[in-house]
A protein has these predicted regions:
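Short, solvent-exposed loop/turn segments at secondary-structure junctions
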Residues: 95-102, 113-114, 130-131, 144-145, ...
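Active-site periphery "cap/insert" segments of enzyme catalytic domains
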Residues: 69, 97-101, 108
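Broad gene-expression machinery/nucleic-acid interaction feature
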Residues: 92, 121-125, 197-199
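A short coil-to-beta-strand element that immediately follows conserved catalytic motifs
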Residues: 85-94
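Short N-terminal helix-initiation segments at or just after the protein's N-terminus
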Residues: 60-72, 123, 142-150, 205-208
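Catalytic core of non-heme Fe(II) oxygenases with the double-stranded beta-helix
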Residues: 105-172, 213
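Conserved double-stranded beta-helix
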Residues: 144-247
């Protein structure tokens, strides 16, 4: 049975600081009084403006930062251990901001497979602030998740959602990151702490994992995924196929 999740220390904290600095600069550009503490964003930005600043920071991260190169320095070694050396990555780096008492940022319990994602992928979740208690996310263990999926498959109806326990919430401080299979049931609740949680997340899967079916054709290589790390042998094989000798 797979581990529910694993937490790792970032290989180089200065790399994480580059992601953090990018977000801070985006906020500071629009909100001059912002003091740089991402966990206190809610004291400087109104709730109605949070999503727009998230989108601005998202665009800045994806367009102006060599994030793939940076991620390789942070977590490639652990991804290779889990997926092998030939890896694809989601085309965009995702950014989440969950301020205290904001119900609009609640993401109910779900499996990413329900929105047609691959069950073979892994999610790397990188908090830009300390993530704890209700400002973090919960992950339901693999045994309970699979039991729920089997019951759902048999009945064909929505099952009663599993209520997360306190122990289901992950505690990950800045400087560390978490790897989990997002097919597991997971989500978040209203942030009842006094701290905002800011986090990055992105999906990875093996280059040799099954390609999407018609059900999830938009999750295929070239649209949803791109190459992240390939061995020389795999690169040669790809180039051989491109010659047209293999149909």
């Amino acid at each position: 049975m797979i581990k529910n999740y694993e937490i790792f220390k970032a290989n180089d904290l200065s790399i994480l600081d580059l992601f953090k600095l990018s977000i801070q600069k985006t906020i500071k550009k629009k909100y001059k009084k912002f003091n740089g503490d991402l966990s206190q964003i809610h004291k400087f930005i109104k709730k109605k403006n949070i999503n727009q600043i998230r989108l601005d920071a998202f665009n800045n991260l994806n367009n102006n930062l060599d994030w793939m190169k940076l991620l390789k320095k942070i977590c490639l070694d652990n991804l290779v251990k889990k997926l092998g050396p030939d890896i694809m990555v989601q085309t965009k780096l995702n950014l989440s901001i969950q301020i205290p008492n904001d119900e609009t940022s609640v993401l109910d319990m779900h499996s990413d497979c329900w929105s047609a994602d691959s069950p073979f992928q892994l999610n790397v979740w990188i908090p830009m602030t300390n993530a704890f208690s209700s400002n973090s996310m919960f992950i339901i263990d693999s045994n309970k998740s699979l039991k729920y999926f089997k019951e759902l498959s048999k009945s064909g109806k929505n099952q009663k959602l599993i209520k997360p326990k306190v122990t289901d919430f992950v505690n990950v401080n800045y400087g560390k990151y978490l790897i989990f299979n997002p097919s597991l049931l997971h989500g978040n609740i209203k942030n009842k702490t006094s701290h905002t949680r800011v986090s990055l997340n992105i999906r990875f899967k093996s280059y040799f994992s099954p390609e999407p079916s018609l059900r999830n054709s938009d999750r295929k290589f070239g649209t949803y995924y791109k190459n992240f790390n390939l061995t020389d042998n795999t690169k040669f094989g790809i180039n051989y196929i491109k010659t047209g000798l293999i149909t």
